[in-house]
Structures are given as C-alpha cells and as structure tokens.
Amino acid sequence: MLQIGEDVDYLLIPREVRLAGGVWRVISKPATKEAEFRERLIQFLQEEGRTLEDVARIIEKSTPHPPQPRKRTKELRVRRVPQMVTPPLRLVVGTYDSSNGSDSELSDFDTSKVKGNRSSSGRTRKVRKMPVSYLGSKFLGSDVESEDDQELVEAFLRRGEKPSAPPPRRRVNLPVPMFENNLGPQPSKADRWREYVSQVSWGKLKQRVKGWAPRSGSEVGQTQQASTAAERAGEMRHSQASSDDDSSRNTGDRSDQMLGTRRWKPKIKWVSLRRCRKEQVPPFAQGTGMPAEEHPEAAENQGAEAAANQRAEPLASPRAEAAASPRAETAADPRVEAVASPRAEAAASPRAEAVADPRAEAAASPRAEAAASPRTEAAASLRAEAVASPRAEAAASPRAEAAADPRAEAAASPIAEAAANQKAELVDSPRAETAADPRAEAAASPRAEAVADPRVEAAASPIAEAAANQKAELVDSPRAETAADPRAEAAASPRAEAAADPRAEVAASPRAEAAASPRAEAEASPRAEAAASPKAEAEANLRVEAAAYLRAGVPPDQRAEAIDSQRAEGPANQRTGATENQRVEVLADQRAGVLHDQREEAGPQGIQEASAGSGSRAQKQVKTVRFQTPGRFSWFRMRRRVFWHTPRLPTLPRRVPRAGEARSLRVLRADIRADVEHREQEEQL
C-alpha cells in the first residue's frame, strides 16, 4: 500500500515488492482517492486472507530497527488530519542522481529529503547539504550558507515539485495505437519530402536543397508529371541560376529524374571523379564503357524523353526546326538509320562529307569515341544518340548547322568548334588546313588528349576557349567570320559551354527565352546571373555568344537549337554520370579549357570563382593538439620499471588469506595476481 504524493509518476512504482512473507503486490493510491483506496485495500486483504494487523506485523518484521508505532494507527491518524492542509506524504521513488555521487553523501541528501517529507514541510528553513556541483566547482566549494546561494539551494530542493495543482486525475490506460495493414499506397520518400517541403519557405528550401523543384501534385499521376516536367526543368534551372555551384552538384542528379523518364545512372563518387580529372580520362571518357552499353536502351528511353521534354518545353519548335534546318538533311534519314545502326549512319552524318577519316575511326568504334569525346560522339554516335538523347539530337542539329554554313571552314569536323577556335586563332591561315587539322587531331580523340592537357584540348575542342578568344576576337574579326564562326561556335558551343558552366545550362532557360528575345535576354539574364554567381566568366561567353548569334543573324531556330542542345545537355551529360558540378569542373577543363583560359582572362573573376567554390562549403576548423610540449610524454619515460618484459616477482599478499580462501592454491595465486595488477595500476596512475 503506498500513499503517493502529487508529482510521483505511477509508472515508476513497482507492481510487486519482495518483503518478508514473500512477494507483495503493490497497490498505489493517489492521495485524494482515500476512500476508494480503503475499500480496495480491504478487498485485497480479504482476497489474501489477511487483516490489517497482519500487514502491520509483517511490515514491522521486515524492519530491523526497533518496532515503529503500529502502522495501522498511523494510517488512521493520517486519515483524521484534514487532507489538504499539508501536501500529502510524498513517496520518493529511488531518485538519486549518481552524477554527484562523489560529493554528496547519499545519507545526507536523501535521508534529509525523506525527513523533510515526514515532517511534511517540503521546504524547511534548514539548508541541506547538496551536491556542490550545483554551485560551481567541487573544489572551489562555494560557501553553501551564503545568502545568494540560498535561492539556488531552494530551487534545487524544490526541483521535483510542480506548483501544486488540482489533484491529479488517475492515469487512464492510454489506448495503444493500432496500425491497420490495409493502408493505402504509402507516399514515396519523394512525396513525403515534398510534403515536408511544402511547409518550408521556398527560399529556405532552395538554400537547403539547391536546385530541387517540387512536383506540383504529389498523388497526381505520371501524366501530369510529364506535363510539368517542362516547367520543372525551367524552375530548376532558374533556381540553379540563383544558387552557387553546389547547386549544380545537386541538380546534377536531380535534373534527369526531373525530366520525366528515369534512367539508369552509374554511381560515381564525385571525389574520385575530381581526382581522376587530374590524371586520367574521366569515367565517361574511359572508353566505350558506359555510353556504349547505354545506347541501346538509352535510345528508346531518351528518345521518348527527348520527345516528352522538348515537346513540353517552350522549345517545341526548335525540335521541329531541327528537323527542318540543316539537320533535316541528316536528321531526316540518319535519325532513322541511326536507330538502325549508328555506325551505318556514320556515313550519312553531316560530319561524313567533311570527315571520312574520323568517321572511319568513329565508325570503327563510334561508341568508344562517343564515350571518349562527346564532341566526336556528338557527330559519331550522335545520330545514334540523336535518338538516344535530346542533347545529341539538339546538338546534332546545331552541329549539323554548325556544319551547315561554317561547313565552309569548320565543317570539316563537327569539332566545328575546334575549327572555330583555330579559325579564331589562325584566322589568317588557310581554312582548309584549319579544318583538316583539328578534324584529324581533335577527332583522334579530342577527349583523351583533352585530358592530357586541357590546353591542347582547348585547341581540339576549344569552344569555350573559342568563345573566350572570340570574345576578344569576335569583336574585331571580320563580321563574316564572326557570322560563320559564332554560328559554328554557338552551335557547337552551347553544348561545350553548357558543359563548361552550369550557368549556360541555367541559361538554357534564359537561352530559351533568348530564342524569343535574345538580345534582351542575353544581356539581362547572363548579367543577372553573372551577378548571382561566380561563373561570371562563363557568363561572358554566353553573352558573347548570344550576342554573336544576333550579330551573325543566326536564325532563331539555330539559336533555339543551340539552346536546345544545351537544354538537353543536362540529362545527356548526366547520363555520362557527370553532374553539372563535374561538368563545370571536369568538362570545363577537359572539354573547353575554360577554367584555364578563361581564368587567365577573367582574372579576378576566376579567382572569385575559385574562392566561391571553396567558400560555399565552409572550411572545417582543424583541431590542434593542445599542449605540444616536450614534457608531454615524460610520464612514459619516468617509468620506474627497468626490465619491461620480466614479470614482477610476486610479492606476498598484504593480508593473509583466510583459511577458507587458502583452500586451493589457485585462489591464492589469483589473489596474488590481483594484488600485483592492482599495484601496477596504482603505479600507472
């Protein structure tokens, strides 16, 4: 029988207790339910065949010290006292915090608590000893009696008590929640995330997950999803524009999931990728491996997706135009025969006329090279991929077009941009040579050599560099060439550049608008974004190139396709497993040499970008070892023991083992060993 006070948790009271006479069942009562308790107690005693006298006697028996006054009478006396005068007796159910076990004597502290309750004044004037740790350091033991500590002590002693409240209602057995198995379709992780996100402000969310855009309705089916894919892609790119380059790291994997169909992506640790940028061809250039396996089904997937996306996106037209424009020649048939055989089509591709030789080699392994150089791939397995990837197809068309009029000089290779750049650099040199040479050299494996040295590669696939150089040269070089060239460059470039900077890709949407109002956009948007992000230099290209479109009078369809090419670029690249970040870091180096050439050129901007790159992930503070003094390990040298490895001779145990213990030598030996160990420990301490 327990009479429990207000703030005791019933759940802490044991249901049965081992006392004299066996196990007792504990009946607890809230102090106020006196009568009820009474009758329950009596009922219980009847069941057990005992009387209150028995109870008293048993309790007495179980207490060793001189018998207390009979419990029964005590209970009656308590009954007689008007209930609410004093807080009822409080049962302290084993609350003793061991945290201060060292400096508060249990006896002092806990017994005083109990005594306090017995005299039923929770707060006696007498200040009890209390764990000093509450009042500052143990060793500076602040003087507990001092007045200012008084409140502290009081507060500490009052710790448990809540302000006395209306008598507690009996705790009702709370219903155990039941879980039905027939729950409807559970929301996917994405849906749950989306739902959670809907409660976060959009700006906050963008900081948290950069580049992620929500699907508009969670339950609404795939159909709607397809339709929203376009806006989502747009939003995604916008949000990406505002956020810095980690954004691109995230969008990297997101964007292709966003774009409708979901396709297999190789799992790549970006760190390793960044490492291998330095010494060897990055995973997607590592030969036929990935893109090659992917092509067969990628063709259906992405073909579908290309259709879905591009139809959905504002750029539905470029796709049509892509068919209409120079690529029509290639697109009409190679698109078909690309499906049939990317290799066969190799001959048909726009690059075919110009390029028999890389063609041959590309035909030898269009895929290998496709993997090796997105540029060549763009031409080689491009048609294959034209089906496979929106990028290829969009790129195919700009490339076809790039080939269409720069064909004159650059058509020699869809590495038109290589030609473009060298044309820029060797403006005076014979077109023939420029065209033939980058074709040969770039086609050889622009990517491999690109990796060998982004600079060389900048020659091979220099678009961004071309963009960079031409940024200078465009301006003064003859308009004709500018027209041909940015066109080549723009057509080829948006893709290189899109790779070179996520901004371009972000600009995919601005650039989509650029198709609508290119000048305003080219100026306004990249400007804004240049402000928004360190990629300003890449921006400059963009701007140049967008302006170049205009100057060159590139018909909107090409522009659109350039755009399209890079709109599709996101997914296509991710297929290669590079996220924009890598695309920035790897492709920008490898494919475009941008981060070299432009960094020189953009000087402060380049630096700003580098710093922003590191700054965005805040530097982790490095912990240093506190005292690196020579004395740090002296304790180790001070060891007394001379022969480390000799066992210490067993000394006699300090106390003679009692007869019972000495029974077996083993006990004795164990004793000695324990002793020795103890001493060693002491020594070490």
Curated annotation (Swiss-Prot):
GO terms for cellular component: 3M complex; centrosome; cytoplasm. Residues 246-256, 425-440, 473-488, 558-567 have a biased composition (Basic and acidic residues). Residues 93-127, 207-263, 281-538, 558-579, 599-623 are annotated as: Disordered. Keywords: Cytoplasm, Cytoskeleton, Phosphoprotein. Component of the 3M complex, composed of core components CUL7, CCDC8 and OBSL1. Interacts (via PxLPxI/L motif) with ANKRA2 (via ankyrin repeats); may link the 3M complex to histone deacetylases including HDAC4 and HDAC5. This is Coiled-coil domain-containing protein 8 homolog. It comes from Mus musculus (Mouse). A motif (PxLPxI/L motif) lies at residues 647-653. PANTHER family: COILED COIL DOMAIN-CONTAINING PROTEIN 8, CCDC8 (PTHR47741), COILED-COIL DOMAIN-CONTAINING PROTEIN 8 (PTHR47741:SF1). Its main location: cytoplasm. Residues 219-228, 611-622 have a biased composition (Polar residues). Disulfide bonds: none annotated. Core component of the 3M complex, a complex required to regulate microtubule dynamics and genome integrity. It is unclear how the 3M complex regulates microtubules, it could act by controlling the level of a microtubule stabilizer. Required for localization of CUL7 to the centrosome. The keyword Phosphoprotein applies. The modification Phosphoserine is found at residues 142, 146. GO terms for biological process: microtubule cytoskeleton organization; regulation of mitotic nuclear division. The PxLPxI/L motif mediates interaction with ankyrin repeats of ANKRA2.
